[in-house]
């Protein structure tokens, strides 16, 4: 592994950081999350058309940039520093890999250029509140999370006219505003139970999308209800796809990207805290000069740097084809963000507890991401189970 960033990677980080410093401060973030879409559409247009962010990690043949998960993780680290609300996670990290892995050539050719230009955003809808299970992050995703042949979840039924969907999906990131939905649905009953992926365009009859009130306002979520909705199968009819395996692979790469994003947020909130303790005075001296405060900040610094190393390795390893590395990096990064943001609230004193200060936004990001993709102990438990660390027998290599 070469830990040195290339000139192109450094340019991605530098350009994105400069843009976000100008256009995505705390007040801009608060304004953006109150908008109908939940993000700044003008900023998203700039990110798409000038920086090529939505198409960063897919081939140039479809209008993308042709980079890898590594570059996408580095870009997400910068977005995490400012908590920039955007459809990047839902579109480029969770949805595009599904289209690349399972979609037909016609579907890729029709949709990917529009995604790369920023014209089209996408979201992944899985039944109930099982996003972390569906992505294989905290458990085996070959279970009954998609419905399992019972009532509930999302059911797919084949008719003379095509496929029809019925059910409900919660925790759909950017589901209220996405122009394209990738829906995981159960079909086949008990005898031939399987999970398939379907495409739904914006405005499809029978689809109800409601934006939910979430703990982390910078990470918009929606509930999607489907009532006998006509849908298009992702991929070719008659072909058999390992949907669970593809979702687990997407979950692994998404975890690496999310780990980098969390590291960016933790690094920024630590920077702000260090700046503050140098200015705030007690007993005639800056509180940052007290040994106890120095020790706390030093511990936070070590934790953030360790999480950064894990996140960078996960991004590199995922791009190189390694599996089951993202979950552990995500666990370490989420823990670092939670501890750093909670310490930031305390070290900022009275102002850290106010709505006006941005410290609470970072704490909510940490808590919200653990609810969506964790919790940390289950991420680690699943990684240990996958490696057979405590089950006896030979340890998987």
Question: Which residues are covered by each model-predicted region?
Answer:
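Alpha-helical interface subdomain recognition
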Residues: 1-80, 102-105, 114, 118, ...
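Short secondary-structure capping/junction motifs at helix and strand boundaries
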Residues: 86, 105-112, 121-123
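N-terminal glycine-rich flavin-associated loop
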Residues: 86-106
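A short, Trp-centered hydrophobic/proline-enriched beta-strand micro-motif
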Residues: 118-137
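A generic structural signal for well-ordered coil/turn residues at beta-strand boundaries
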Residues: 120, 150-152, 177-179, 193-194, ...
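A short core secondary-structure module
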Residues: 125, 168-207
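Flexible, small-/acidic-enriched active-site or ligand-binding loops
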Residues: 136-142, 171-172, 201-236
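A structural signal for short hydrophobic beta-strand segments in well-ordered beta-sheet cores
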Residues: 154-156
């Amino acid at each position: 592994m070469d830990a040195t960033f290339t000139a192109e990677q450094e340019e991605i980080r530098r350009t994105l950081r400069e843009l976000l410093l100008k256009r995505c401060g705390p007040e801009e973030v608060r304004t953006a999350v109150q908008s109908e879409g939940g993000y700044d559409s003008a900023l998203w247009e700039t990110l798409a058309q000038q920086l090529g962010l939505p198409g960063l990690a897919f081939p140039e043949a479809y209008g993308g940039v042709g980079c890898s998960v590594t570059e996408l993780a580095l870009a997400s680290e910068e977005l995490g520093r400012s908590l920039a609300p955007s459809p990047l996670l839902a579109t480029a990290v969770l949805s595009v890999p599904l289209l690349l892995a399972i979609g037909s050539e016609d579907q890729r050719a029709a949709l990917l250029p529009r995604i790369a230009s920023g014209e089209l955003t996408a979201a992944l809808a899985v039944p109930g509140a099982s996003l972390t299970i569906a992505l294989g992050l905290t458990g085996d995703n070959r279970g009954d999370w998609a419905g399992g042949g019972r009532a509930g979840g999302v059911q797919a039924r084949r008719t003379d006219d095509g496929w029809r969907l019925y059910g409900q999906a919660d925790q759909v990131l950017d589901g209220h505003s996405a122009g394209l939905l990738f829906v995981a649905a159960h079909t086949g009953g008990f005898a031939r139970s399987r999970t398939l992926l379907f495409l739904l365009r914006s405005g499809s009859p029978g689809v109800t999308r409601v934006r939910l009130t979430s703990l982390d306002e910078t990470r918009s979520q929606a509930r999607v209800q489907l009532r006998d909705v006509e849908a298009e199968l992702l991929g070719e009819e008659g072909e058999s796809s390992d949907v669970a395996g593809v979702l687990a692979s997407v979950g692994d790469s998404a975890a690496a990207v999310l780990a980098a994003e969390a590291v960016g947020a933790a690094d920024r909130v630590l920077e702000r805290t260090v700046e503050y303790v140098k200015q705030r005075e007690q007993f005639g001296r800056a509180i940052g000069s007290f040994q106890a405060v120095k020790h706390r900040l030093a511990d936070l610094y070590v934790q953030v740097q360790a999480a950064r190393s894990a996140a960078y390795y996960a991004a590199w390893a995922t791009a190189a084809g390694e599996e089951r590395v993202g979950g552990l990096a995500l666990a370490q990064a989420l823990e670092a963000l939670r501890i750093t943001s909670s310490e930031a609230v305390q070290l900022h004193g009275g102002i850290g507890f106010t709505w006006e200060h941005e410290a609470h936004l970072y704490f909510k990001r940490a808590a919200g991401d653990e609810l969506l993709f964790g919790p940390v102990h289950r991420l680690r438990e699943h990684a240990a189970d996958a490696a057979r660390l405590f089950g006896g027998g030979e340890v998987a290599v």
